[in-house]
Structure formats: C-alpha cells, structure tokens
Amino acid sequence: MILDDLVTVTKIRLARHQRQQSLADLKQTVAKMPRNHKPDFLTRLKQPGLHVIAEVKKASPSKGTIVTDFPYLAIAKAYDQAGADAISVLTEPDYFNGHLHYLKEISQQVSVPTLRKDFTIDPYMIYEAKANGAVIILLIVAILTDQQLRDYRQLAEKLGMHAIVEAYTAAEVTRALQSGAKIIGINNRNLKDFRVDFNNSLKLRAMVPDNIPVVAESGIKTQEDVEKLAAAGFNAILIGETLMRSNQKRQLIAAFKERA
C-alpha cells in the first residue's frame, strides 16, 4: 500500500533529521521564534463563506511530476494575492518532491497561514513544522493511534498552531471527533491506493457537528464541485493539482471563492 510506503520513508527521513538536529536544539529554535502575527486559521474558518487552502505541490505518487516548472515562491505569492485563506506546502521529498525549505521560504513571504503537508508521525515533526514557519499541521487518522491524535493536536496548540485531523472513512471521522479535533479534513483520496471518490466527503460531512469546521480535500476540479461542497456545508476546500496545472491560478481561486 502506498500509505505504508510513505510512512516507512518518513521514518527514515525523521531519523536522519534527528541525527542532524536534536529535539532539544529544535525546541530552542522554536522558543526563540518571534510571535506569529498571521490571521488565526481556526477563526477564519468559522467565518461565513467557503475558504480556500491552496496547495504548492510539484509531484504526487499517483500523477508523478505535476509541473516541471516550479517557481514555488511565485506560486505561493500568487495564491496569497488571489485571496487564498491558507497555503499548503508539501514537505515530503520522496513521493511528492517536497522540501522543508519550501515551507520556510513561503511562510516568510506570504501574509496567510501556512500548512505543513506531510505525514506527521512524531512530535519532532511538529516542532520542525513550527521552526519552518507553519502554523497548521496535518494529522492523518489512518497512521496514528488515538493517543497520538490527541497528544499531537495538543502539542500543536501549545505551540500556537492548529491541526487538521484528516479522515477518509466513517470510522476515522468518529476517531477524529473522539480525539477532540477542532478542525476535521475529509479526504476524497484513499491513501492506501490513491484512488479518488469525490462523493466521499459529501457522504461523510453530516457526521461532523456544525460547530467544528470541515475541510474537503482532493479531487476538487470544477466550479460545480466547489458549489456542491459549499451547499453541503463545508467550511473550506484544499486544492492542489487543479491549481498547479492551471495557468490562471489567481483567477481560479477568485472564481472558486466567488461561486461558493
């Protein structure tokens, strides 16, 4: 399964990073960071309208290289100027061609919150996300225990960050809710085989109480898709490949927000 492979390479990368910089040193780096002055992501999600998390992504396991020309800073700035509410940055290198320095540079250059899009499997990665400018992390229910889901979210909040707790099945949505998640992501992509079912998020949306913001992820391509998700009561959409392939990124974000 692709997800198992992703976790395996993440463990190898984590061990390498831990050898390069100890957790104690990383904590010191985080402690010295200036206060974040970007808009609070959770507060923004609770405001009316459908919010857009625009993703900076060069490749994926299912599609391979999505774009060969990858001016990641220019892309992120275009998203910011177009009115994106947050910017998701892939930092997984082996399957997504991501890198932590993309996150750090983008975080320094945009006015909106940034999400570290990766496979968080250890507290070290949460401190690492913070040290590189992220104010949002992703916690994937399928790869974490109930205790980890709760502990990692609480650690993120202690560091002044938010966690999107991502589910794909009804059972995972239940676990996300039981863990105390304050933001839930419903993925249309099955991370075990990377197949997409757009209706997955529509089917599971009703499981989440209205007081908890919900983000729809993956397979969102058209204005009709966006309108369906808005009508179903989603608070936000995360869009990656569709934006990355577009030559009119700013116009597309503006259109999605306007039509919703």
From Swiss-Prot:
Q: Which SUPFAM superfamilies match?
A: Ribulose-phoshate binding barrel (SSF51366)
**What EC number is given for this enzyme?**
4.1.1.48
Presence of the UniProt keyword Lipid biosynthesis in the record:
no
The record, for InterPro entries, names: Aldolase_TIM (IPR013785), Indole-3-glycerol_P_synth (IPR045186), Indole-3-glycerol_P_synth_dom (IPR013798), Indole-3-GlycerolPSynthase_CS (IPR001468), RibuloseP-bd_barrel (IPR011060)
Work out whether the entry's keyword set contains Cell wall biogenesis/degradation: no
Q: Listed GO molecular functions?
A: indole-3-glycerol-phosphate synthase activity; phosphoribosylanthranilate isomerase activity
Q: Pathway listed for it? A: Amino-acid biosynthesis; L-tryptophan biosynthesis; L-tryptophan from chorismate: step 4/5
Q: Keyword set for this entry?
A: Amino-acid biosynthesis, Aromatic amino acid biosynthesis, Decarboxylase, Lyase, Tryptophan biosynthesis
| Reactions this protein catalyses | 1-(2-carboxyphenylamino)-1-deoxy-D-ribulose 5-phosphate + H(+) = (1S,2R)-1-C-(indol-3-yl)glycerol 3-phosphate + CO2 + H2O
Q: Which GO terms describe its biological process?
A: L-tryptophan biosynthetic process
Name the enzyme's class. Answer: lyase
Q: What family does the Swiss-Prot or TrEMBL record give for this protein? A: Belongs to the TrpC family.
Please give the name of this protein. Answer: Indole-3-glycerol phosphate synthase
